Amino acid sequence: MGDVEKGKKIFVQKCAQCHTVEKGGKHKTGPNLHGLIGRKTGQAPGFSYTEANKNKGITWGEETLMEYLENPKKYIPGTKMIFAGIKKKPERADLIAYLKEATSN
């Protein structure tokens, strides 16, 4: 899998303006991502999701994140996430490695 330190840099550059990862972190434009791995789409408590996110019904893990982060709007049409995605698979792997560590209990 990916490199956690490289993934942290990617998170800071591309994700942190809209997301937090720490336990009890605030929702911003996007939901707090703590507890992401193993959670179903559209389930962060207290965040207002689109119906598309709530109805997708997948569980976040390495494979689903790998596909989603390549092109969020293609994976969940109707998501309000405006991020275009990360085309390079090694960068997605690094980000996922960071998210697995940073968002776990």
Swiss-Prot record:
Keywords: Acetylation, Electron transport, Heme, Iron, Metal-binding, Mitochondrion, Respiratory chain, Transport. The modification N-acetylglycine is found at residue 2. It comes from the Eukaryota. Binds 1 heme c group covalently per subunit. The keyword Heme applies. GO terms for molecular function: electron transfer activity; heme binding; metal ion binding. InterPro entries: Cyt_c-like_dom, Cyt_c-like_dom_sf, Cyt_c_1A/1B. GO terms for cellular component: mitochondrial intermembrane space. Heme c binds at residues 15, 18-19, 81. It is found in: Mitochondrion intermembrane space. Electron carrier protein. The oxidized form of the cytochrome c heme group can accept an electron from the heme group of the cytochrome c1 subunit of cytochrome reductase. Cytochrome c then transfers this electron to the cytochrome oxidase complex, the final protein carrier in the mitochondrial electron-transport chain. Belongs to the cytochrome c family. This is Cytochrome c. The lineage of its organism: Eukaryota, Metazoa, Chordata, Craniata, Vertebrata.
